[in-house]
């Protein structure tokens, strides 16, 4: 039996680049031995120009209704939680927060894919310009500082080609900020499985120096992503090599509404 029993990073077809029905995703996780499953699809982002990789705002109500019903149906077999993966865009983050106040969102994870709501720079590809990495780290730290996120997803998504030494000071300050704020760093199974260049030993050796806490995230975009126990175990073993604590719980809330 693999050690991958909790996962808070699961997508749905609403994000336009995942497959499978909601029920199929929950069933696949259950069949794989996952005991606690968090659904965290790419959040609608009112005001953002980049909408092709996230659900539309009008789909949010159905998202919560569907998984609320599945939570009841699967009760006693798998513990189901409903949240979102979101990005931090300073110019429209308050608008997103106000939008989410109307829904029973239990948690947010921070996954910074773009440099702005206009989608000017996509961080998922290796780059040659260290200033791109610096901006990514700036946004990730600012997002973590809002206090609304449970953890930082694929923290090493933005990465340099070739010589990694220029990346070190930026990865170092990212890891230090996460530790100071008490937020885990995700070891991303999607990147591990597809050999995307992350999770990277370079980044997590820096996390090891800093003494960060880790969390495993499937980043599942298909029910099939839960289907290979050998991959789940290999990712678990890879994360364990750094000797850092790996958490299996995150804080939940009943609403994002500010008091």
Where are the language model's segments positioned?
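An N-terminally biased module of ancient metal coordination in phosphate/nucleic-acid-related enzymes
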Residues: 1-90, 161-175, 182, 189, ...
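Domain-core and long-helix interface of multi-subunit machines
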Residues: 16, 109-210
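Short amphipathic alpha-helices and their capping/turn segments at secondary-structure boundaries
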Residues: 22-35, 91-105, 136-146, 173-176, ...
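Well-ordered, non-membrane alpha-helical segments in soluble/globular domains
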Residues: 59-67, 133-137, 232
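Hydrophobic alpha-helical segments and helix pairs
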Residues: 78-123
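Mid-to-C-terminal alpha-helical segments outside catalytic/metal-binding sites
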Residues: 229-259
């Amino acid at each position: 039996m693999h050690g991958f029993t909790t996962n808070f990073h699961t997508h749905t077809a609403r994000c336009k680049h995942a497959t499978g029905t909601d029920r199929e995703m929950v069933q696949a996780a259950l069949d794989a031995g996952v005991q606690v499953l968090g659904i965290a699809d790419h959040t609608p982002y009112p005001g953002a120009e980049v909408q092709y990789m996230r659900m539309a705002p009008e789909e949010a109500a159905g998202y919560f209704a569907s998984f609320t019903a599945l939570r009841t149906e699967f009760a006693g077999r798998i513990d189901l939680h409903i949240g979102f993966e979101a990005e931090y865009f300073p110019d429209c983050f308050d608008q997103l927060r106000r939008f989410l106040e109307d829904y029973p969102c239990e948690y947010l994870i921070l996954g910074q894919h773009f440099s702005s709501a206009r989608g000017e720079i996509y961080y998922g590809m290796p780059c040659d310009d260290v200033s791109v990495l610096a901006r990514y780290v700036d946004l990730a730290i600012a997002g973590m500082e809002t206090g609304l996120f449970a953890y930082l997803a694929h923290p090493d998504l933005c990465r340099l080609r070739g010589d990694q030494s220029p990346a070190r000071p930026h990865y170092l300050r990212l890891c230090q900020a996460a530790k100071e704020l008490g937020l885990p760093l995700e070891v991303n199974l999607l990147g591990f499985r597809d050999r995307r260049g992350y999770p990277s030993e370079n980044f997590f050796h820096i996390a090891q120096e800093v003494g960060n806490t880790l969390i495993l995230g499937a980043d599942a975009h298909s029910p099939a992503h839960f289907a290979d126990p050998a991959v789940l175990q290999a990712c678990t073993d890879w994360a364990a090599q750094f000797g850092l604590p790996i958490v299996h719980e995150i804080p939940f809330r009943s609403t994002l509404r500010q008091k």
